[in-house]
């Protein structure tokens, strides 16, 4: 690292089932004269499944253990243990992803010096083999997109803001292949509107969509923090996202919104954007059996600092928030929201980043459930800022 330039190399693995590697470079003063940023990154990941024999043998193992448990406890000694997870690794069921991106950003002088404009050109390739957890199960899918973002930030401190605001408006757009490739995508469907899995796999060889997002946060100290450093701070937020299509017969299952929980679904969110909403299970607010093509989230949070040092920040918080997701843009309703409330704590350490834990209670019923979201604990680790 020199002159603010950053090179990041990371790797993550879960034995043979999941591997992820990435490398990125960021220069905040590209050219050395003006605050123009430049970035380039690449990543690769692979996730595999287990054989269906695992579930069959698990049933077999549990069944016979229940029979013989009264005759010497065979199950206790793991005789014929069919549940050894490693033995069911199936390399023929997998999803691989790799991608490249290059970005550029510029600080604007109008309307004021707090505005920035950035652009990123990205390419991702998905290679799926008998992957049953997504609408596309086999094939190769390509995603080329241009992301434009207009943002403004006037906060006084990135770790514990006490005044100012942040907002961003972004558009992520792919080429409209269906408008010029000459294919009859309606013909991929049966007369009753259904579609075979083979046709579904062919439908998304080249992914197309346009994605729009708006996010805003404000920070207000409830006392003069220059004389009362430990003043309470009120943070308010509002955000929404829409995923549109050029052709109604080619709606993208990629880049959809996965709403609910702590926003830390990890490597399972390979083709979706995770949106946190505390007080509910992960992904529980996305309509069951479909994708989220629209979402909204809003909330207020009251923060109290326990320690504000150069290298360490600790604060506690209480919050009210609400949000929801819809499987069609036309169903978007900012007044149909799932509500929650809770408390939490945040600790920032230089070598780790932000850590925290929240307890939240969801007051409303979710899709496919007759009960309210209920009580949940949520964790914040590293640089993830989905719930902070």
Give the residues covered by each predicted segment.
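Generic long, charged, amphipathic alpha-helical segments
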Residues: 312-318
């Amino acid at each position: 690292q020199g002159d603010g330039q950053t090179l990041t190399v990371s790797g993550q693995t879960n034995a043979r089932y999941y591997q992820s590697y990435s490398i990125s470079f960021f220069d905040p003063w590209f050219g050395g004269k003006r605050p123009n940023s430049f970035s380039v990154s690449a990543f690769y990941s692979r996730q595999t499944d287990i054989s269906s024999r695992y579930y069959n043998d698990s049933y077999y193992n549990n069944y016979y253990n229940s029979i013989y448990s009264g005759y010497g406890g065979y199950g206790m000694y793991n005789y014929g243990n069919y549940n050894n997870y490693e033995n069911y690794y199936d390399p023929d069921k997998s999803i691989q992803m790799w991608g490249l991106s290059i970005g550029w950003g510029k600080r604007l002088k109008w309307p004021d010096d707090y505005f920035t404009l950035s652009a990123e050109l990205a390419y991702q390739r998905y290679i799926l083999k008998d992957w049953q957890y997504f609408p596309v199960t086999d094939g190769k899918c390509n995603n080329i997109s241009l992301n434009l973002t207009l943002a403004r930030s006037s906060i006084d401190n990135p770790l514990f803001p006490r005044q100012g605001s942040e907002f961003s408006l972004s558009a992520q757009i792919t080429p409209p292949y269906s408008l010029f490739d000459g294919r009859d995508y309606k013909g991929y469907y049966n007369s009753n509107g259904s579609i075979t899995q083979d046709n579904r796999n062919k439908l998304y060889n080249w992914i197309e969509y346009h994605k729009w997002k708006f996010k805003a946060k404000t920070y207000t100290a409830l006392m003069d923090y220059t004389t009362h450093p430990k003043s309470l701070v009120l943070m308010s937020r509002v955000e929404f996202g829409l995923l549109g299509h050029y052709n109604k017969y080619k709606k993208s299952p990629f880049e959809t919104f996965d709403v609910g929980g702590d926003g830390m679904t990890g490597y399972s969110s390979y083709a979706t954007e995770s949106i946190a909403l505390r007080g509910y299970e992960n992904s529980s607010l996305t309509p069951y059996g479909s994708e989220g093509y629209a979402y909204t989230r809003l909330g207020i949070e009251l923060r109290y600092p326990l320690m504000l040092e150069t290298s360490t920040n600790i604060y506690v918080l209480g919050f009210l928030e609400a949000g929801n997701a819809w499987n069609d843009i036309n169903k978007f309703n900012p007044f149909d929201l799932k509500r929650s409330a809770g408390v939490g704590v945040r600790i920032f350490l230089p070598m780790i980043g932000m850590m925290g834990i929240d307890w939240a209670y969801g007051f409303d019923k979710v899709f496919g459930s007759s009960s309210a979201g209920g009580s949940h604990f949520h964790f914040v680790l590293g640089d993830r800022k989905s719930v902070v």
